[in-house]
């Protein structure tokens, strides 16, 4: 059966390639660790050559009786390898275990390194010796029996080998009553020396098929690199080796070697099936190598080793149902314990192996290498305490494999118990390594449905290194109880430089890290010594996806646990850097509604310190992840450890909070809400320091920087549920991101946060919640449709600031929502800064729900201390934002009424684009107890500063109960400056229907400055209102009120370098009552028609102007003026003093002892009245003159006022109602009134004021009525001036030339149709179709441009339309036909805003006669033209008029056709020369016209007639081929208008009673015309045509084009 021989060979079956394979897989020699990327054969070659230098000589002699090779011999001696060819396997089914020699022909036992040669498939099977011994509980004593047998008979072995074979066969048989236990068996055998020699060569306890026992006295050393052990080497295509159903009590049931085992070149494969050991492995050795084999099948093996009883469950080298590789003698794993599966060509199946009470369901080793294998590998349904498939006390290296590797259904069975705690390093459903687990440069790797009852559903390792994969790596549906649904690592997880897709899908863990956990298990709260990242996902070009992983899914907890969650990743520091492939976190869950703890959440990522996402060029997506929800149950009291005292508990809460935040937290004071008692009973508060949420990420620090790919956070859910309750100090929320310190989103390309939600009533930050948030230097940023239950529908910084700065493109917050404040951005304890952004900034349709019983504010932004919007380059939009109580767009302040009154300021300055607040609103009306506190349709703040902006600042259509535009809190100030654009308040409406620009609350808020630079305006179309009319800012009693104003209009610069303000402050509508003493220092204070401005005093300084319009009122009132401040009087030596007493200046108390001087509250030196504002009402009533009203009992400071009448729009003299007839015109009215409620009346004391009137001069540029102004006079407090009209000067825009020019345009339209008829339908080519009938259709276009000629206005005319016609030859060479057409177009004035829209209908009849070379043709075209005229006169209004014009054109032409001799060369270009002459007559009638609207005119009817004689020639080229005939023609003509009657119309301007004759533009009578045409007959039934006509006259260009199709019958 076995031919045994010993040979010396240079190359034994244990070939050089095996060693290379081992080295390349990373096996260590003399502490050198070589990897595939670092392969250096020098280390091996040097050692190998030292041991085999002299083996090159072939030795064929057989050594008999010599000693085995001594490993301790000198390196220069030759190494001997015993070669044993195997010819057949063995079966133990027929063996009698009671026979002492039952292993004689079954087991191969050797004491020297042996190479077994195999050339066919051999199987050892069906032997069970487990009953020979029960496994020992001590790992080393289990080998004592074998060692004893070997030592006792060592001296006899040489004799046994040289003994005659016949003697061997004559040995006594072992008695049938031989004890079954090995101890008694050895004792019995020792009594009989004859059989002891045989038994010593066979061991029924292990290595039933192959047993290698090293007999050397020298143990394996760390320096010994020579090979010792068993080599199974296949040769030939049929070589294979199998072990089936071999079961033994000790390690290595089938194969045992106390040195190394090598399986190589087994083409038909290697198999271990249903083998079992009660200790370690079916095959056990110091190192095991499987290389260059075919299919490897390792199934249904088991080990009965009980590490729990031995207290060795953490020894990952023990167990292994199939292979166990460990060194018993040397603790340094570099000297042994390596299990290598390298370079195999067949499939590897490792299935249903079991190590129920030990580690490594299939393999247990010191380190494991799986490298360079070419076919698929499957580890399926294996189980063990740790490492369901493989366990390693050091590293696991899986690299360079070409085909798929799958770990599925493997289980780690170890669970929490008396000796296993939460922090023990155990688990690994498929793989467990106490060192580094490397997956490198593999094709496909899949870990599916592996489970662990502790850590690492698929993998448990100190470090996991996944890199350089070229295809998919997938972890799917793995589960763990404690940490890492897929991977759990102590030190680091590295996913780097992968080219293929990495997928973590539906992995689940009860506690931490749904897909990956990496961190310290002893105390996850503590920072690790190494501050670097411990989860690194870097440099990957393939996609990485975390899909539907779950963490912290317990429903009932027995104790509280912090730092739980991380649906995909859990780590101390997490880094996603420099990935070019897309990274996606989708549908991961990091928590449940039942979890109890203080730092819980992170739907995708939970980090105890820092998360960094940087430098990624691929997209990074977080979608549909769900963070921790608040607990709804108490910790089960009957299962909980004793609760600490209140003091210790409080101290623990504070320490825990500080640990996670690295600083103090100051959660905002919120509005106190009553929680129903039933809700408190059902869902009690668990902790007052809960930190929960982060639908995508929960960490202490979050940095998202320098990513060039798109970043998208979409549909993530963080925070609590609707029914949850939390304590006052809870920090809950962050629909996408939750950080207890800062979130930095900086220098990225495109960032989008959409549909992220944290919906509990105490949750904040629908997208981002942090202590501080920085969003800066990104290209574009968008927050859309995010929502929260408390603050920050999109972004919330609970303690400090939100900074949105230096972004390069658009920043958008739209459709975000929340309940309390800041649907876009919230900083309830800090500030908001929006600064230095280069693109547009938009806050649109953000919504704060609010309620009638709860304060809320800031539809777009809420901040406690300040909002600063500064130095942004693009437009800034706040549109359609809404809130409950305060600030539809922006609220700066506190929602807690009792909170301190620190200054709150909104600053908008230095911005380059336009700023718009439009359609923002508050929804809740103020209650009676808070009458004016709710409001601010656009803005609610204490201090408002809008200055130095380059664009317009507009407030349009905002709504609120008060302060529809802006509301200012008590004690606040307003400073507005129109710098580079206007500031406008228009259409801002309070709930009561009143228009309100700014509302100031309390009795101390005020406007400090309203200024505009030159040519800029601050325009109040809406009124300014105050809650209290107490006069603000009265000076000390020794200072005159007018000398210390509290309101400045157009402030003067303090020095020459400062900005002058010479623009206009305009109040355009409503009544603005400002209880402040004001001064206008420069520029203009203007009141538009019917506007009213009430002031407590007004001082006008030199160089400024006050412009009043008709119906406007400037009123000075004296209500609640404190008399402790003196008023200026005529007698400066006398002062009115009444300390602390409020007086009514209209009822002064006379002093009988001395005269009381008249006080002065208005110091006005000049008034300007806008003449153009005296526009009559609809019924023709003239408006009232502007009024100046002062308090009764006071006077104007000066008895002289300069009154200037101006006409700023140059239309003042177009006021027909005012100036068309002689009348006395009141220009201004001076009155007095008592208090704020008194009726203004004329006061005789004001009639003595001297008013110098300056009237507007009439210049050549002045149009309208002319006349003479008379001297002014005072009548009943009114200044009256007389007007005597002398004439009217017509503005050229009213000349009406466009109406008359339309007649020429109609002529061009009629002629265009006539020219089509002459060019296509009455030509010789058509006449040659005898007795045919044609139906045709065409499209036409006309363009005409006439410049201004002299004083006459030119025009531009455009027209398009279509025509349909039919013609026939009744007799030969005689054609008649007709057509219908419709045109649409317009005619516009060259100089003015006047346009006439045209829609015309035309009909035509035509005929032609062909007589030899003569062609006579004629046409008659009639038109009915509808006209709609619109004239825009700007401020004067618009007039319209409509009429129908009628006209016709008749023309005839005579052509002579000269055919060019075809023999001439020119005939190739011109076949026919056609001279012609035409006669043409046109007549167009204009009916009488009456306009509607403003400045209406009437036009008398008139007519336009013209007779023209065109003559010239045409050059034709005819071409025919088959049924196709084509004629191309070029025509040139000169036109002379022999008669013309131009239109002249008498036009009347009704309101001015002025008439004049108007003429159309004088078109020159001479013209040149050219035409290009093509007529093609494609066959006897179809023809097409095209033509372009061009006409040139001096100052006029016209051209038309036509094209059509003709069907021939």
Swiss-Prot record:
Please give an example of a GO cellular component term from this record.
extracellular region
Keywords carried by this UniProt record = Cell outer membrane, Cell wall, Membrane, Secreted, Signal, Transmembrane, Transmembrane beta strand
What InterPro entries is this protein classified in? Autotransporte_beta, Autotransporte_beta_dom_sf, Polymorphic_membr_middle, POMP_repeat
- Give the region (Disordered) as residue ranges: 132-183, 640-677
* Compositional bias (Polar residues): 132-145
The annotated topology with respect to the bilayer is: Peripheral membrane protein
Main subcellular location: secreted
**The Autotransporter domain, residue ranges:** 1328-1609
Q: Where in the cell is it found?
A: Secreted, Cell wall; Cell outer membrane
Q: Which Pfam families match?
A: Autotransporter (PF03797), Chlam_PMP (PF02415), ChlamPMP_M (PF07548)
The record's annotation in SUPFAM superfamilies points to: Autotransporter (SSF103515)
Compositionally biased intervals (Basic and acidic residues): 149-175, 651-672
Which residues, if any, are the signal sequence? 1-30
Coiled-coil residue spans: none
- What protein family does this chain belong to? Belongs to the PMP outer membrane protein family.
Under which name does UniProt file this protein? Answer: Probable outer membrane protein pmp21
Q: What does the record give as the organism's lineage? A: Bacteria, Pseudomonadati, Chlamydiota, Chlamydiia, Chlamydiales
